[in-house]
From Swiss-Prot:
InterPro entries with a match to the protein in the record: SurE, SurE-like_Pase/nucleotidase, SurE-like_sf
Gene3D superfamilies: Survival protein SurE-like phosphatase/nucleotidase (3.40.1210.10)
Annotated gene: surE
Matches recorded under PANTHER family: 5'-NUCLEOTIDASE SURE, 5'_3'-NUCLEOTIDASE SURE
GO MF annotation, one: 5'-nucleotidase activity
Domain of life: Bacteria
Signal sequence region: none
Cofactor binding description: Binds 1 divalent metal cation per subunit.
Binding site for a divalent metal cation: 8-9, 39, 91
Keywords: Cytoplasm, Hydrolase, Metal-binding, Nucleotide-binding
Name under which the protein is recorded: 5'-nucleotidase SurE
Length: 252
């Protein structure tokens, strides 16, 4: 079993080290992670400059680019053999609902999915790593299940783990994505030189945390396991849009 491991918090993040340690005896691991924190980088690729790859003292490879860069470079330039699985994380904070659109952790996994490789993104819901060992144990259990019974279609799974002791986790629930309220306003401040600058505000609170959502599972102390897809087509609107666009199609 060949496993590629990445993240978005950077190659020296505790979450990455914990995930690698938890999976170390499950196969041949290759670690390729960003040089610095790229939280919120989403699926961005670096196209305006070359990328460099260096090796840390612990053997981890790190790239001066985004999480997507890391997986892309690993799959197309660093690894001689295609991995059987790609895992990303463990992220320092939740990736619930709308977070998945911005998450570098999820983006690393989705890049592997684009190459037809099963991928799993892991996140510890609260920041600070208080119960990181518990999250790593839960991540291992899920990876073990994927190894023992691989999902038929290349899977893209988003996993959020409550910040609590392993013994207090209330199992795993298969969920859909919930939804957040819009983000808080930007925070405006002034630099010592008199320039006005803006910080992106905090994420919004849960707007859809009903039963069946990832938010609901986490609030109830369960690990949320959400299957994702990258096809953004709104199939339910195709027929309506065809009728709406008919005059344009005929006379543009």
């Amino acid at each position: 079993m060949r496993i590629l491991v990445s993240n978005d918090d950077g190659y020296n993040a505790p979450g990455l080290e914990a995930l690698v340690e938890a999976l170390s005896d499950l196969g041949e691991l290759t670690v390729v992670a960003p040089e610095t924190n790229h939280s919120g980088a989403s699926n961005s690729l670096t196209l305006n400059r070359p990328l460099s790859v260096r090796q840390a003292a612990n053997g981890f490879l790190y790239v001066n680019g985004t999480p997507t860069d890391c997986v892309h470079v690993a799959l197309t330039g660093l690894m001689d053999t295609r991995p059987d699985l790609v895992v990303s994380g463990i992220n320092n904070g939740a990736n619930l609902g709308d977070d998945t659109l911005y998450s570098g952790t999820v983006a690393a996994a989705s890049e592997a999915h684009l190459f037809g490789i099963p991928a799993i993104a892991f996140s510890l819901v609260d920041k600070g790593w208080e119960h990181l060992e518990s999250a790593a144990r839960a991540a291992r259990r899920i990876v073990e299940r994927q190894i023992a019974a691989p999902l038929g279609v290349p899977a893209l799974l988003n996993v959020n783990i409550p910040n609590r002791r392993y013994e207090d986790l209330r199992g795993v629930r298969v969920t859909r994505l919930g939804k957040r309220h819009p983000a808080e306003p930007v925070v405006r401040t002034t630099t010592p030189y008199g320039d006005t600058v803006y910080w992106i505000g905090p994420v919004g609170l849960a707007a859809d945390a009903t039963p069946g959502t990832d938010f609901h599972a986490i609030a109830d102390g369960a690990v949320s396991l959400t299957p994702l897809r990258l096809d953004l087509t709104q199939y339910a609107q195709l027929e309506q849009l065809g009728q709406w666009a008919d005059p344009l199609c005929a006379n543009l």
